[in-house]
Amino acid sequence: MSEFYIGVMSGTSLDGIDLALCEIEDDAFELLLCASYPFDAELKSDILNAINAQTTLKNIGEIDIRLGKMYADALEKFIEENSLKRVKIRAIGLHGQTLWHEPESQNPFSMQLGNANILTARLGICVVSDFRQKDIALGGQGAPFTPAFHEFLFSKLSGNVAVLNIGGMANITLLREMLSGYDTGCGNVLMDYWISKYNGSPYDKDGEWAKSGTPNRELLREFLKEPYFLKSPPKSTGRELFGEKWLKKQLSEFAKKNQNCSYLKARDIQATLLELSVQSIANEIKKSDTTLLIVCGGGINNRYLMERLQEELGDIKIASSDEYGVSSEFMEAMAFAWLAHERIHKKCVKISSVSGALRDSILGAIYE
């Protein structure tokens, strides 16, 4: 019997809350409705301050509650606007907002905020959340999890297929006999930060500002020396590495080595950041035997980024997931609806070959 699930996703970019109502029955999956709701600007600022260690334990606790309320508000609007009956929704899959992700420390952890109890109390609907904790407890990275969903969607395609998600971070999935996938590094996050700092825009529409600049190859080489790019998978990352602090440090060190770098304009740095995303993605795709690259995530709307990626990848075919009947914009929200379904039905998610965990496991905690 088919069931209805709502996936909730707010990513590294902090640019909105994506909701996806999906109908799922065994191997059948359909996106029925989807919508995006704005992310509270003050809450976004407080989250970024917390990531940059400008916070207190009290603030972190309050952010957890405020996020829960914001998710509940968005869900209530979604349900009301679409005249949905709450009793027919089997569960909500809530990723939460990642505050810090450190799976390789002595005491590995991944912290997602957004109190699931608030959602169940307000909506009267079962919520599945805390997806990453079990995988980390089993020695895994706890990320990325979308490769398992990509395999569910695209495993029947012929050829050597890869799936690329470009959000705040970028991650790839290699659909081979043994599933693999990992974060390649930054996607939109540094470009979004830089244009917001200089132009006040939340993102670089079509990559126009980056295109107006000239990439600095020497600066790009310095960026690409980041040890994360040299690390072999399994690996995952986030704002705790590729954020404001990282970029400021890189630019400061570059300025010290190149005393006369006043010629480097803000738009040139934006162009270099776009090239960083392109090169760090392309370098990984080129290592594989990929013939078809399916792209999803907000980065697909950056026209110049996609043009540069195609130039770098040459004969490899690049296609939007929309061409295969899967929403490129709501892929991650759909993934968490699917993960909620897997948890409700006590199915192991086959992700250990991606995360490096000791074994596959049932992921997520149920809040009722």
From Swiss-Prot:
ATP binds at G11, T12, S13, L14, D15, G16, I17, D18. Pathway: Amino-sugar metabolism; 1,6-anhydro-N-acetylmuramate degradation; Cell wall biogenesis; peptidoglycan recycling. Pfam families: AnmK (PF03702). Gene3D superfamilies: 3.30.420.40. GO terms for biological process: 1,6-anhydro-N-acetyl-beta-muramic acid catabolic process; amino sugar metabolic process; peptidoglycan turnover. The keyword ATP-binding applies. It is an enzyme of class 2 (transferase). Disulfide bonds: none annotated. One of its GO terms (molecular function) is ATP binding. It catalyses: 1,6-anhydro-N-acetyl-beta-muramate + ATP + H2O = N-acetyl-D-muramate 6-phosphate + ADP + H(+). SUPFAM superfamilies: Actin-like ATPase domain (SSF53067). Its EC number is 2.7.1.170. Keywords: ATP-binding, Carbohydrate metabolism, Kinase, Nucleotide-binding, Transferase. It comes from the Bacteria. The keyword Kinase applies. PANTHER family: ANHYDRO-N-ACETYLMURAMIC ACID KINASE (PTHR30605:SF0). Catalyzes the specific phosphorylation of 1,6-anhydro-N-acetylmuramic acid (anhMurNAc) with the simultaneous cleavage of the 1,6-anhydro ring, generating MurNAc-6-P. Is required for the utilization of anhMurNAc either imported from the medium or derived from its own cell wall murein, and thus plays a role in cell wall recycling. Belongs to the anhydro-N-acetylmuramic acid kinase family. This is Anhydro-N-acetylmuramic acid kinase.
